[in-house]
UniProtKB/Swiss-Prot annotation:
EC number, UniProt record: 7.1.1.-
Record protein name field: NAD(P)H-quinone oxidoreductase subunit H, chloroplastic
Family classification: Belongs to the complex I 49 kDa subunit family.
Organism listed in the record: Lactuca sativa (Garden lettuce)
SUPFAM superfamilies listed in its UniProt record: HydB/Nqo4-like (SSF56762)
Organismal lineage: Eukaryota, Viridiplantae, Streptophyta, Embryophyta, Tracheophyta
């Protein structure tokens, strides 16, 4: 019996779902011809929890603890966007001190998110050492978060019109010490990684996205800036008090996985610059706008009513969302995090649409991996930086 020496059939391989510490519960159905990728189909939804529907049955204050479960590695940003939307709807002013503290927390959260992108990304392409180094610095950031908010993750720190509590005594000095220490840490990463020939072999020229292509796909964040587009919502939308600090938008022209790595590494240095300026120039004054209590809708209690017995319990303020629609957005570590909010003269939102950066950025994955090698899939997927909590919502 004679037969062909080699078979020409295509092979279909399942990649994932992965462990949450790496790429989360993402499943890729990959069609291979030998080691060449012919097609790739991402399967989503394993972490879908109905976050948009839950929002329609909660007041904004009640919904705050839920939002930290979207991107659970950059929780300050999900809180920021959740309070920014009703602040814009109700034209609520945030005190200058609260705005400075918000910026400090947001930039610390950005660094923590980029660190936990860097470690698994390097582990994916075979470098185990940085995976352990990043936890050293990330732990210091979480210590700062714990001192200020009481929680290492899922902080529930932002409030409409300000923040939950002022910074504790000595926190500013500790944070300045961390900034000085972390700059040496970034230099160590760059010395260890950036010019490593094996690392460059794996990332240079892999997963190239052109500037026009990035815009057409709706990409944002480091994915967009690595393709030569200088677009950062902190500069574009002028939210919080970013205009008062001296910093630069980090970008690269090449559009490959190396460019995305360089953008994120540079962003961590810029975040430290912003934090140092905010800490040194932080003004005094209140940390929340007590005027927003006017927006409370508390009905008059009858003396013998059931609610009256629990009047000593501090009620959470409820805000009437005016009958209009609004799109609010912030520059999260992974890209543009937005909320489309429709009010209906009630305390619950009529519609609460989340625009997660990871979900939009992930769309381009099948196009990027076609005609690449199987081993390049993890490099490209890692360079996109997704968290399935916000992709699936």
């Amino acid at each position: 019996m004679t037969g062909p020496a080699t078979r020409k059939d295509l092979m279909i391989v399942n990649m994932g779902p992965h462990h949450p510490s790496m790429h989360g519960v993402l499943r890729l159905i990959v069609t291979l011809d030998g080691e060449d990728v012919i097609d790739c189909e991402p399967i989503l939804g394993y972490l879908h929890r109905g976050m948009e529907k839950i929002a329609e049955n909660r007041t904004i204050i009640q919904y705050l603890p839920y939002v930290t479960r979207w991107d659970y590695l950059a929780t300050m940003f999900t809180e920021a966007i959740t309070v920014n939307a009703p602040e814009q709807l109700g034209n609520i002013q945030v005190p200058k001190r609260a705005s400075y503290i918000r910026v400090i927390m947001l930039e610390l959260s950005r660094i923590a998110s980029h660190l936990l992108w860097l470690g698994p990304f390097m582990a994916d392409i075979g470098a185990q050492t940085p995976f352990f180094y990043i936890f050293r610095e990330r732990e210091l950031i979480y210590d700062l978060f714990e001192a200020a908010t009481g929680m290492r993750m899922m902080h529930n720190f932002f409030r409409i019109g300000g923040i939950a509590a002022d910074l504790p005594h000595g926190w500013i000095d500790k944070c300045l010490d961390f900034c000085d220490y972390f700059l040496t840490g970034i230099a160590e990463y760059q010395k260890l990684i950036t010019r490593n020939p094996i690392f460059l072999e794996r990332v240079e020229g892999v997963g190239i996205i052109g500037g026009e292509e990035a815009i057409n796909w709706g990409l944002s964040g480091p994915m967009l800036r690595a393709s030569g587009i200088q677009w950062d919502l902190r500069k574009v939308d002028h939210y919080e008090c970013y205009d008062e600090f001296d910093w630069e938008v980090q970008w690269q022209n090449e559009g490959d996985s190396l460019a995305r790595y360089l953008v994120r590494i540079s962003e961590m240095t810029e975040s430290i610059k912003i934090i140092q300026q905010a800490l040194e120039g932080i003004p005094g004054g209140p940390y929340e706008n007590l005027e927003i209590r006017r927006f409370d809708r508390v009905k008059d209690t009858v003396w013998n009513e059931f609610d009256y017995r629990f009047i000593s319990k501090k009620p959470s303020p409820t805000f009437e969302l005016s009958k209009q629609e609004l799109y609010a957005r912030v520059e999260a570590p992974k890209g543009e995090l937005g909320i489309f909010l429709i009010g209906d003269k009630g305390v619950f939102p009529w519609r609460y649409k989340i625009r997660p950066p990871g979900f939009i950025n992930l769309q381009i994955l099948p196009q990027l991996v076609k005609r690449m090698k199987l081993a390049d899939i993890m490099t490209i997927l890692g360079s996109i930086d997704i968290i399935m909590g916000e992709v699936d919502r």
